[in-house]
Amino acid sequence: MRYFKKIVGSRCYLSPVNPDDAEKYAEMLADLEVARNLVIAPQIISLPAEREFVERACKTGYIFAIVDLESDTLIGNCGLDNVDLINRSSECGIFIGNKQFWNKGYGTEAMCLLLDYAFSLLNLQNVMLQVYDFNARAVRSYHKCGFKEIGRRRKARIIAGAAHDVIFMDILASEFTHGRIRVPIEPQEDKK
């Protein structure tokens, strides 16, 4: 599979999602260890359903494949949802579905790249996310990116018979310190 390097970091890059990757995503999401951390955990992800999701995501332009910079291996995806360009706000989500890349900083870097896109190119002011209380690894990663906890919905999710809090976190553009995107804008000469 060929990926396009839209936003590049030191370990990974974000590429527009490709409908041909639907099977890889469906396989990743079929792993309960991966899916339990996501809102979709109780759902059964079929290949046709995942293909439909990816095709829909391609049309929004706000969902990216996360790809390892060294090997060009697809490792997950991230994106913005409910983008409100008038109020300059959005929600975001991420998953690293290839477990070989867990605990190596890929999720943190991919989220920072996504936030850089949101704040530098879309000119958003606020980005919010939700995470389960048992997902300590993700909470630490989000704190590293600059997210702050803004509230909890207590015992709002029952997973494997246990009640868990949903933690709400957000970050403002003024709080984001990991920005890298620089788009050189040079004056165009008037051709007469």
Task: Map each language-model feature to its residues.
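Short coil/loop residues immediately preceding or within conserved phosphate-binding loops
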Residues: 9, 61, 75, 87, ...
